[in-house]
Amino acid sequence: MKKKIAIFHPWIKSRGGAEKTVLELLKNFKGSELYTWVYEKDNTFEEFKKYKINVIGNNFFRRFSHSNILRGLFLISSFSSKIPLEKYDLFLISTSGVGEFILFKNYKPGKTYAYVHTPLRDADKDIINWNLKNKHRNIISKTIYLLAVNVYK
C-alpha cells in the first residue's frame, strides 16, 4: 500500500537545489501534497504547477520571506499553520533553520521526519561577523540581526 505523505517546505520562491529536492520527493511519492508558507509560482520551477500546493499560515508574514533577518517572524506564523495530518501516513519537513517551527501545531508521533537540505547559513559565525561588518552597520539593524540569529545558537 502506498504511503500518503505531507511534505512541508517553508518557502517555494526560487529555483534552487532545495526546490529541486522537493520536486523529486513529489515525483517519487505519488499522491503526496506540499505545504508551504510562501509559494511564488512565477519565481520557481514550472513543474510545481503539476502538484497540489497548500499555502498555509498568516498572509502578513509572507512579505518578509525575502529578508534573512525577518524570516524568523515565521515562528509566529507557525502557531496558526495547521496541517490536517490525520490524512497522511508520514509528515516530512524540509528545514534549514525555520522549517521546524511548523511542529508547534503539527506533529505525528513516530511519523514525523525532518531533513536538512543545507545548514542555516545565517547562523554561521563567519557569516554573522561578515554581516555585522558589511550589512548591518547601524545599531538598530545590528540589534535586530543579533536577536534573530541568537535563536539558532
Where are these regions (language model features)?
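Short, well-ordered alpha-helical microsegments
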Residues: 15, 22, 98-102
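Short amphipathic alpha-helix
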Residues: 18-29
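Short aromatic-enriched loop/helix-cap "lid" or pocket-rim segments at secondary-structure transitions
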Residues: 19-20, 44-49, 104-105, 124-128
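Nucleotide-activated donor-dependent transferases that construct or modify glycoconjugates
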Residues: 2-15, 37-39
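Hydrophobic/aromatic residues located in beta-strands of well-ordered beta-sheets
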Residues: 5, 32-34, 112
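Short, solvent-exposed loop/turn segments at secondary-structure junctions
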Residues: 12-13, 28, 39-42, 96-99, ...
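Active-site donor-binding segments of glycosyltransferases and PAPS-dependent sulfotransferases
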Residues: 33-101
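Acceptor-binding helix/loop patch of EC 2.4 sugar-transfer enzymes
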Residues: 51-54, 59-65, 109-152
